[in-house]
């Protein structure tokens, strides 16, 4: 019986140590919830909002950034794809059907092997086959208007003329059901979740530790300050935090309503 | 008292096991018939994609009757809503399914692995005519027998849980896999038959031709068990990398295609190796428990030897396991870069830091047990001075493996370190450093084993000095090669070469293990023994290393099982069948590890209870033997 108890105590202690380590010593990152299905008001969409939708799809639902980033080197960077698209059409290796830059970018998303940038093909295929998934099917499942939004985003990013047309008709019921990307957030908590503020800040129940704690920020800062801190984060640096940590583009990412909701929320957090 | 008198004959409990197994078999046998919709009154809100999209029947549709008939037999994956998932007050369906599946898997891994090495040990016993091997093989299989019925119980619980909480999912899977489920049920029956004949016929088939028949039954038991696992693996991997269905999840009619999906073979290999390592560790824990409870030096000697053998099996399988895991991960990337990056670069990345701690614990405890084992030999004094250096290298490698890529820090810490990445420690966080560390750790663990193996021997061959020199040269060359590959290709070239160089690192490690083992076996053939090995002369603390090994293995399996399943994210079947249940979210690491810990506590409680029962029944048997 003594051995039995000793062994039980030892085993439980080991298990509890692992549980403690995983809970207390490892940062608890809250994964994004499954995509929410929401309705989209396409009738009143402006080109700025459409580009914004493309930005959000690129960094969110499209999961493009997983590979097209400067860290991993897994896929070519797309900052200038709006510019180089026309040049690719003249490349002797190009075997697609596109006639314009816009068509080339669309084709590269729905038929990735039409042209593979040198060095980024599937191993052993001599860059004839792309490892990229078709973005309109499978786990990504972008709708045609979302593909167009991403093209508009690329063109705007490269500084070329935006040739994509805004969607003229309301999307089908199925489109509406799935298009969650550009839906404006309905509450400050949704804004926090949508833009991942909690990854760095303590806010709305999230426990980020890289940036200042915002749970009582309203007691110290007024709305003007808070608005500026979102739009131009390097304008004022909180003591003890290095400059340049916060992405500077929330000013163009957040919709006006979302920004105001967030600022109100922070101002009331006392 | 002879050890053979400890053998417990359990006819009444055998009947109970048989009844449980028969019940499970009957249950599994009926499962494929659940394909029929009337078995599933729950989930009436389910809308199948084809039904939703199907227009009213037209003459042309009638003309296409034959092609449509195919779609009627194999419906697309249903589009479920929250209300299609039955709720039972006070019970969370996902946690219930999670724990039932995990407990089933732990016990199943154990009962599939033990017959593999029991077969090998029995064959060694036959070849060497050393009865100790036969006794030990019998005791191993005895331990797994109780676990066999518990495996069946948890398997049944899992199926019931799926019927109650995920009826539409089960219906969809049964719609595709029903022939394999039927085969599974038959094979389960065959496995039970093989196991019971193998175990209960052990003493009746001890001599002559009967022994050969017995060994053949052991071989059949392994074949049937392995095929069983491969079938279950097909279901699991289909959920991760579906094949043989179209984009809507409509089965295209070729059973081999859905079985032979992209991740089937990598998982098959990984699970076979991991099961052996795991089975060895649990049997090692059993031997440790018996060692600690032993009252005579003869018992201590027997269970020391059993623990050593079990640990040897566990470590032998542990060494190639990272390579099988590497292949599996590479295939996940090859199937879907998204899934691969979710696994290694997304929210799951931190789980690999926990994995590093666990594998570090496995390696350290295994090495510690080997070092303690040197006390059995008087010749070990020649090598004990090297242990501290080996320990230093292994701990150093563990720390590299353990270094995270990005640290979550307080603002003060962030400022002090100069940004999110430390100047010197930052580079240790990426895979090339970790690949280098794990390969060196494996090589030094192998070195520990080699020292242990030769500590009681003196080579008598004329070329012993040359052999030693060659071995040292192979070790040195491999370590330099691994380090250079890791540093140069890891930091000074692009990603493609980083990945490719890891293959050469693995090849270096395998070269060391295989070539040095061959040289060692030849060099110590006919070697002189320093003194007889003193089995049983082990400190009690060494036995806790075996427990640490078993508990860490169990926890690690639970964690990795969670990751394997969770990288599907909000999909029942990745990309074709979405999970719309209220529990479709990916939990935080803390949440997941709490569930894993609860599962491990339940598992260990049952296992230790089985050991304790074995102790009680053994005492009874001893008492009867004295009478």
Regions found by a protein language model. Give the residues of each.
Chain B
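Hydrophobic secretory-pathway targeting helix
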Residues: 2-42, 485-489, 557-558
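Coil-to-alpha-helix initiation sites in intrinsically disordered, low-complexity, charged segments
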Residues: 1-2, 41, 90, 254
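Polytopic transmembrane helical bundles with strong interfacial aromatic enrichment
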Residues: 50-51, 56-627
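Intrinsically disordered low-complexity regions specifically enriched for long asparagine
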Residues: 12-21, 43-51, 70-71, 101
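Sec-dependent signal peptide cleavage junction
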Residues: 33, 37-56, 60
């Amino acid at each position: 019986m003594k051995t039995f108890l000793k062994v039980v105590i030892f085993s439980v202690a080991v298990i509890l140590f692992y549980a403690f380590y995983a809970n207390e010593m490892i940062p608890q990152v809250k994964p994004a919830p499954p995509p929410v299905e929401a309705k989209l008001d396409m009738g009143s969409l402006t080109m700025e909002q459409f580009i914004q939708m493309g930005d959000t799809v690129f960094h969110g639902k499209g999961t493009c950034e997983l590979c097209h980033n400067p860290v991993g080197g897994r896929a070519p960077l797309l900052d200038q794809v709006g510019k180089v698209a026309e040049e690719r059409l003249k490349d002797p290796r190009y075997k697609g059907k596109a006639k314009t830059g816009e068509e080339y970018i669309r084709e590269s998303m729905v038929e990735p092997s039409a042209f593979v940038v040198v060095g980024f093909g599937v191993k052993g295929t001599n860059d004839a086959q792309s490892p990229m998934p078709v973005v309109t099917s499978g786990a990504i499942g972008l709708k045609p208007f979302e593909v167009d939004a991403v093209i508009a985003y690329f063109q705007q990013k490269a500084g070329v003329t935006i040739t994509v047309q805004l969607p003229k008709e309301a999307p089908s019921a199925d489109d509406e059901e799935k298009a969650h990307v550009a839906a404006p957030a309905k509450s400050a908590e949704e804004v926090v979740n949508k833009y991942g503020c909690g990854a760095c800040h303590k806010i709305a129940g999230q426990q980020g530790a890289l940036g200042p704690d915002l749970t009582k920020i309203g007691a110290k800062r007024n709305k003007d300050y808070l608005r500026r801190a979102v739009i131009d984060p390097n304008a004022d640096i909180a003591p003890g935090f290095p400059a340049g940590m916060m992405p500077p583009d929330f000013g163009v990412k957040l919709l006006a309503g979302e920004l105001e909701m967030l600022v109100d929320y922070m101002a009331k957090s006392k | 008292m002879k050890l053979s008198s400890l053998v417990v004959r359990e006819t009444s409990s055998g009947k109970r096991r048989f009844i449980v197994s028969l019940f499970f078999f009957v249950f599994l046998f009926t499962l494929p018939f659940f394909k029929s919709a009337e078995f599933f009154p729950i989930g009436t809100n389910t809308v199948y994609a084809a039904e939703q999209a199907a227009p009213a029947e037209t003459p042309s549709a009638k003309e296409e009757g034959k092609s449509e008939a195919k779609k009627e037999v194999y419906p697309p994956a249903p589009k479920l809503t929250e209300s299609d998932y039955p709720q039972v007050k006070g019970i969370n369906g996902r946690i219930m399914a999670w724990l039932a599946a995990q407990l089933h898997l732990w016990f199943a891994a154990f009962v599939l692995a033990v017959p593999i090495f029991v077969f090998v040990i029995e064959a060694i016993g036959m070849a060497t005519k050393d009865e100790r091997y036969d006794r030990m093989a019998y005791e191993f299989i005895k331990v797994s027998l109780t676990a066999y019925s518990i495996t069946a119980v948890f398997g049944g619980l899992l199926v019931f849980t799926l019927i109650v909480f995920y009826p539409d999912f089960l219906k969809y899977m049964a719609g595709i896999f029903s022939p394999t489920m039927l085969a599974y049920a038959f094979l389960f029956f065959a496995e039970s038959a093989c196991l019971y004949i193998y175990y209960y016929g052990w003493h009746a088939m001890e001599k002559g031709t009967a022994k050969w028949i017995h060994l053949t039954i052991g071989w059949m038991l392994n074949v049937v068990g392995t095929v069983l696992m491969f079938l279950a693996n097909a279901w699991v991997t289909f959920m991760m990398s579906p094949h043989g269905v179209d984009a809507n999840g409509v089965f295209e009619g070729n059973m081999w295609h859905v079985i032979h999906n992209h991740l089937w073979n990598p998982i098959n290999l990984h699970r076979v190796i991991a099961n052996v390592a795991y089975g060895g560790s649990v049997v090692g824990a059993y031997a440790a428990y018996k060692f600690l409870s032993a009252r005579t030096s003869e018992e201590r000697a027997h269970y020391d030897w059993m623990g050593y053998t079990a640990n040897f099996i566990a470590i032998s399988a542990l060494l190639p396991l990272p390579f099988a895991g590497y292949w599996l991960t590479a295939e996940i990337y090859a199937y879907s870069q998204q899934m691969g990056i979710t696994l290694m670069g997304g929210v799951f990345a931190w789980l690999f830091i926990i994995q590093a701690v666990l594998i570090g614990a496995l390696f350290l405890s295994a090495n510690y047990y080997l070092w303690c084992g040197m006390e059995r030999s008087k010749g070990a004094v020649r090598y004990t001075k090297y242990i501290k250096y080996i320990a230093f290298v292994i701990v150093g490698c563990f720390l590299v493996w353990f270094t995270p890529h990005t640290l979550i820090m307080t603002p003060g810490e962030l400022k002090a370190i100069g940004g999110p990445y430390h100047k010197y420690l930052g580079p240790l966080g990426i895979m090339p450093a970790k690949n280098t560390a794990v390969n060196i750790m494996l090589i030094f663990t192998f070195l520990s084993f080699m020292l242990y193996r030769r500590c009681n021997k003196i080579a008598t061959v004329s070329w012993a000095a040359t052999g030693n020199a060659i071995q040292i040269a192979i070790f040195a060359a491999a370590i330099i090669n691994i380090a250079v590959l890791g540093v140069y290709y890891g930091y000074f070239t692009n990603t493609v070469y980083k990945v490719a160089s890891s293959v050469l690192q693995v090849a270096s490690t395998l070269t060391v293990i295989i070539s040095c083992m061959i040289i060692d076996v030849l060099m110590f053939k006919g070697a002189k023994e320093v003194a007889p090995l003193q089995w049983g002369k082990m400190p009690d603390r060494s036995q806790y290393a075996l427990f640490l090994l078993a508990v860490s293995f169990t926890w690690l399996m639970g964690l990795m099982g969670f990751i394997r399943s969770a990288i599907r994210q909000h999909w029942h079947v990745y990309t074709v069948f979405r999970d719309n249940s209220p529990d479709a979210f990916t939990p935080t690491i803390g949440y997941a590890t709490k569930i894993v810990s609860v599962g491990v506590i339940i598992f260990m409680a049952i296992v230790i209870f089985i050991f304790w029962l074995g102790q009680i029944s053994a005492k009874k048997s001893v008492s009867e033997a004295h009478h």
